[in-house]
């Protein structure tokens, strides 16, 4: 890999930054960042071949506008957080003097509209999930009101078999 310098392409910098921060992040956080960087952020900026030193707030803003055609505002907010953090590190190690993401309008979060399954839909969901790797997370989510991220983020250490409790973090 190329050494980190300001002439590095932003897309290449992101790949190297991911390796640098990997030891400092929880596994689930790293997986989330990695997914966003690999699937959306790198492909967009790689196609535009923008050097880190030449990255402008408008480049980032146009990325957000492009992504809002594909994903929710909430997802683009997550992209913003990752890009901002990556560029903050670039400033810290003197690759760039300012963080262009500071000058970008953060996308608005989509309003949450809750929905729920009725008893027949729940029965169909349980039947469809039976015997799959999703059976337990779906069961826990349904009976304990867990969010998707809470259900998939559960660890054995969260279960206290002596006191029959489950700790959600």
Language model feature labels by segment:
Residues 7-13, 49-52, 155:
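Short, structural beta-strand-to-alpha-helix junction motif
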Residues 8-15, 61, 77-84, 102, ...:
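Non-catalytic, well-ordered alpha-helical scaffold segments
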Residues 13-14, 56-60, 118-121, 133-134:
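N-terminal alpha-helical segment
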Residues 1-7, 19, 23-24:
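N-terminal helical hairpins
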Residues 1-5, 161-169:
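Short, intrinsically disordered, charge-balanced linker/junction segments flanking boundaries
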Residues 18-95, 111:
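N-terminal core-binding DNA-recognition domain of tyrosine site-specific recombinases/integrases
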Residues 73, 77-79, 92-98, 102-154, ...:
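Basic, Lys/Arg- and aromatic-enriched nucleic-acid-binding interface segment
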